[in-house]
């Protein structure tokens, strides 16, 4: 009888403390899972922020006004980037001397 009571007491204590140890293990596993999820979330957030910054830089680069050539600047052909009031034309004043068209006002050459 004493042995039975002793065995039941040990069994009860082992079950009680065994569950406590499992709770501690579960708690530490949950913390580790939370930390890994947090690190994963931070890496995803960093990637999204980097992507957004690249998109913003791309947008700023595309929205910048393109450079154009001013009055009396030599141009190569009609598709050269003369500024808006000017066009690339062969002129009688400069074209015959330098043998290239120039950016001039529309209708002046």
From Swiss-Prot:
Propeptide: 19-67
Main location: secreted
One MF term in the entry's GO annotations: sodium channel inhibitor activity
Cellular component per GO, a single term: extracellular region
Pfam family name, one: Toxin_22
Domain of life according to the entry: Eukaryota
Tissue expression per record: Expressed by the venom gland.
Secretion signal, residue range per the UniProt entry: 1-18
Annotated InterPro entries: Toxin_22 (IPR012627)
Entry's localization field: Secreted
Disulfide bond sites: 68-83, 75-88, 82-103
Alphabetical keyword list: Cleavage on pair of basic residues, Disulfide bond, Ion channel impairing toxin, Secreted, Signal, Toxin
Secreted in keyword set: yes
Family: Belongs to the neurotoxin 14 (magi-1) family. 07 (Jztx-56) subfamily.
Domain comment in the entry: The presence of a 'disulfide through disulfide knot' structurally defines this protein as a knottin.
Function: Probable ion channel inhibitor.
Protein name in UniProt: U6-hexatoxin-Hi1a
Organism: Hadronyche infensa
């Amino acid at each position: 009888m004493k042995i039975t009571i002793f065995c039941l007491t040990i069994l009860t204590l082992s079950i009680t403390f065994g569950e406590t140890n499992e709770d501690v293990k579960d708690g530490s596993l949950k913390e580790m899972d939370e930390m890994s999820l947090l690190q994963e979330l931070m890496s995803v957030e960093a990637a999204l922020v980097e992507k957004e910054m690249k998109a913003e830089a791309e947008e700023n680069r595309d929205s910048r006004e393109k450079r154009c050539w001013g009055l009396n600047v030599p141009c190569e052909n009609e598709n050269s980037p003369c500024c808006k009031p000017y066009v690339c034309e062969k002129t009688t004043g400069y074209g015959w001397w330098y043998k290239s068209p120039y950016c001039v006002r529309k209708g002046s050459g």
